[in-house]
Regions:
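Bacterial N-terminal signal peptides that target proteins for export
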Residues: 1-10
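C-terminal motif of bacterial Sec signal peptides marking the signal peptidase cleavage site
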Residues: 17-20
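Bacterial signal peptide processing site
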Residues: 22-24
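Periplasmic/extracellular, small/polar-rich flexible segments of pilin-like filament-forming proteins
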Residues: 27-29
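Feature marking well-ordered beta-strand scaffolds used for ligand recognition
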Residues: 31-486
């Protein structure tokens, strides 16, 4: 495709995303810069061991000097090594997306699933598209075994989700605003390398993000721009049935192990009994037990909500327990300038929230880098990709290897790559590792990295799988004993 046309497509994509995020951010006015007393401090940086190629400046920064000197072509690593990768070469469109899921079937086949579309299906320019299925039996040599090309899989946006308990993969058709709500459901339990399509149905109302009850029987279709959080019964995978639509805007959401709680990032809408302003951004806890129990005409109740001074765009919240105590790991995407050109450039990044009293959730610590700090804004603004509203410095997704006593959390932090934090002491997390792959020349936008995906894990081998929008799928091993077992 001619370069001027490609640039036009890319710029239109940015314009649409900015408009969509503005409508779904739930912030009616731009915020001033957070005061010094409100700005959380960066997480202590990692100590890099043998074999590392550490960053050259402040934590998380990839400078223009790094690019012009050729340093970015070597990549940046700290207590990590790449053991395998998969990507189409010389691509114009994206080759990685928002989610990486892992599933091991009864026969022992180990599989990875990841979307390749990101904002819009620009990968169709390269005759690629959909959700890639990789056989990861040998993680040093991932093998593409299938491409899922049904409507939702062609453009799932942030909705690709998997139930490990049931062996079900699902997504809702979406884009940066919202898609028409077509839900695709696949059975992966028999042979994970070759998913079996069970249904394609317009049951999701509007799509952008999703959630899945761990038992794989309730799929939630969500949109941050419209109060249309929809629960769908997947008891019969071939016949999805809408249960109800909840009047709440939801970006990312996670469901508790028993299916009775939904943890919503975003949260604008008009929930009966809401404990906060209708358009307040943050994290909301919902009681969805009547949906899980399949009660006739179920009622959903808001339990609580919480926000924080450094908020940008709440992305996802994951329930965990550490030593028997419940917490959430939440991450904001991008900066507040993404949704408002007059924004102060506040970077939300990540945090840990204590929900021991679920009626009074409380932020207890933060997951952020030195480059995220307001005092470093002038320094970072000239870095490659830093001023693109859909790239830049900031967070996008976090995930944990287990929800019970996880020792680490791994987060995609866009230009800063994959970052790994030790959370055994949730009040005092610390960075232990990072991986930012070598960059490659690009026509537009300029050469940089675009780590956006929720990662998956192989704890027994200390591996983390994730994707970069520009360079594809990576299997990364944490080295030097940085990832503690307990």
């Amino acid at each position: 495709m001619p370069l001027p046309i490609l640039r036009t497509i890319s710029l239109l994509t940015l314009a649409v995303l900015i408009s969509a995020c503005s409508s779904g951010s739930n912030n009616s006015t731009s915020k001033p810069p957070a005061s010094a007393s409100e700005v959380p401090q960066p997480t202590p940086r990692a100590t890099c061991g043998p074999g590392s190629r550490p960053e050259t400046g402040i934590q998380g920064r990839v400078s223009r000097e790094d690019l012009t000197s050729g340093r970015t072509r070597e990549g940046f690593t700290c207590n990590t090594e790449m053991i395998g990768s998969y990507s189409k070469q010389n691509n114009f469109g994206t080759v990685g997306g928002f989610k990486v899921e892992r599933y091991t079937d009864a026969a022992g086949h180990d599989c990875a699933y990841y979307d390749t579309t990101l904002l819009f299906p620009t990968n169709l320019i390269d005759a690629q598209g959909g959700v890639n299925v990789l056989d990861m039996s040998d993680p040093t040599q991932p093998v593409l075994t299938a491409q899922l090309l049904t409507p939702a899989m062609l453009s799932p946006h942030e909705s690709l989700v998997l139930s490990k308990e049931r062996g079900v993969l699902a997504a809702v058709l979406g884009n940066p605003a919202f898609g028409p709500g077509v839900v695709d459901v696949y059975d992966i339990s028999g042979d994970c390398r070759h998913p079996v399509l069970k249904s394609v149905a317009p049951v999701g109302v509007l799509g952008h993000e999703s959630g899945f009850s761990p038992d794989g029987k309730t799929f939630y279709s969500a949109s941050p721009g419209t109060p249309t959080l929809t629960a769908i019964d997947l008891t019969n995978l071939s016949v999805p049935v809408p249960i109800m639509t909840i009047p709440l805007k939801s970006h990312g959401l996670s469901i508790s192990a028993d299916g009775n709680r939904a943890y919503i990032a975003g949260g604008g809408g008009n929930m009966p009994g809401s404990s906060g302003p209708e358009n307040a951004s943050g994290m909301v806890i919902l009681d969805v037990s009547e949906i899980q129990a399949r009660k006739p005409k179920p009622t959903v109740r808001e339990i609580s909500r919480v926000t924080w001074p450094s908020i940008s765009i709440p992305q996802n919240a994951i329930p965990i327990t550490i030593k028997g105590k419940p917490y959430l790991v939440e991450i904001d995407e991008y900066t507040d300038s993404t949704t408002s050109p007059s924004g102060a450039g506040n970077i939300g990044a990540g945090r840990i929230i204590d929900i021991s009293d679920e009626t009074k959730p409380k932020v207890i610590s933060n997951l952020r880098l030195e480059v995220h700090q307001p005092e470093n804004k002038a320094v970072r603004d000239g870095d490659p990709g830093a001023n693109l509203p859909v790239q830049g410095y900031g967070g996008h997704y976090c995930n944990v290897p287990t929800r019970v006593d996880p020792t680490i959390v791994a987060c995609s932090m866009i230009i800063s790559g994959l970052r790994v934090f030790d959370i055994r002491d949730p009040f005092h997390p610390r960075e232990i590792a990072y991986f930012n792959p070598p960059t490659s020349p690009r026509n537009f936008p300029e050469e940089s990295n675009w780590a956006m995906s929720s990662p998956s894990f192989v704890p027994e081998r200390k591996e983390i799988w994730y994707t970069d929008g520009f360079s594809g799928f990576y299997a990364v091993r944490v080295t030097n004993g940085a990832w503690a077992d307990k």
